[in-house]
């Protein structure tokens, strides 16, 4: 029997009303699956829609944004059909998020243990003494020494604050964890420690993780599957092995060429000319066409369909061959 995904995003589209009144198409037709115990990496340049995708799934979009199409199925229940009260019951208990920039996400005037305990008590999961024990368990799990749990965020290093954010996200024992650029602004050694911690916690708790990053090294380290985003759309998706060893979309290919390869340290790194499209001025055809080194005439006028190029591997490119992906 085929395993059902824990999270299934289908044809998700999001529009923004910009400050000048123009409509911006932040996401269009985004689809992917996330399975229990596995990590999906959402990869792409800044502004491609990665964080917007997470916020749409959790229904935490700003007031000037709206979901215009699609489904977000969590355990086969469409989250977009829930009332706000029902959705509040789902957040933190079923799915949680490690926000980018722990210093900004943590309350600067509350001790770390107070913040984690408050999250538990707000969701009526335990009484005060039970919540306090739970805080101790979480801090031990993420590697924060007992003598430091009562300190304030500014007393922590960047890596320690990130560990505290992970503990806070796990406070209500979710099954699905979103991690939005969890290693940003951390040095290489601390990045490795945070990634190892996420992997260890995932193995212990059986979590599904959606990891947002622009760092292909992070993806190679921890992800089972990858969705490469560009201009608010999924350009290519598949297992991490197939994406790295056999990229089908020109954008993915260029991204990988721009990443250092230790097997050929003297090789030149590729660059992608131009800039990503603005959400208010998207190309009529393929979003990547203005920057693509392999474009053909049809790319400028017609958006490519998402094709299944091999089992579990799909790409939206006119140069690819295969049946239309069944999403």
Describe the role of every protein-language-model region.
Residues 1-246, 315, 321-327:
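ABC transporter nucleotide-binding domains
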Residues 3-5, 149, 237-327:
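Short catalytic/signature loops enriched in Gly
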């Amino acid at each position: 029997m085929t395993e059902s995904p824990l999270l299934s995003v289908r044809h998700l589209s999001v529009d923004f009303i910009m400050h000048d009144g123009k409509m911006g198409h932040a996401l269009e037709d985004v689809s992917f699956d996330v399975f229990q115990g596995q990590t999906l990496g959402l990869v792409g340049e800044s502004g491609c829609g990665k964080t917007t995708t997470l916020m749409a799934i959790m229904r935490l979009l700003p007031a000037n944004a709206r979901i215009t199409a699609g489904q977000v199925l969590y355990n086969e229940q469409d989250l977009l059909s829930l009332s706000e009260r029902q959705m509040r019951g789902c957040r933190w208990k079923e799915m949680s998020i490690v926000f980018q920039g722990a210093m900004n996400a943590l309350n600067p005037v509350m001790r770390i243990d107070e913040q984690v305990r408050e999250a538990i008590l707000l969701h009526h999961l335990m009484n005060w003494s039970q919540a306090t024990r739970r805080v101790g368990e979480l801090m031990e799990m993420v590697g924060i020494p007992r003598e430091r749990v009562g300190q304030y965020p500014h007393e922590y290093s960047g890596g320690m604050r990130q560990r505290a954010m992970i503990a806070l996200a796990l406070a209500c024992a979710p099954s699905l964890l979103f991690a939005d650029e969890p290693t940003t602004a951390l040095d290489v050694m601390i990045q490795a420690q945070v990634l190892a911690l996420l992997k260890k916690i995932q193995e212990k708790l059986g979590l599904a993780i959606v990891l947002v990053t622009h760092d292909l090294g992070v993806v190679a380290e921890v992800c089972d599957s990858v969705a490469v985003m560009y201009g608010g759309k999924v350009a290519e998706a598949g297992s991490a092995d197939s994406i790295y060893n056999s990229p089908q979309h020109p954008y993915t290919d260029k991204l990988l060429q721009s990443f250092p390869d230790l097997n050929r340290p003297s090789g030149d790194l590729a660059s992608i000319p131009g800039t990503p499209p603005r959400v208010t001025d998207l190309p009529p055809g393929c979003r990547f066409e203005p920057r693509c080194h392999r474009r053909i005439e049809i790319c400028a006028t017609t958006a490519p369909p998402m094709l299944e190029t091999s089992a579990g591997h799909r790409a939206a490119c006119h140069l690819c061959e295969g049946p239309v992906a069944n999403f």
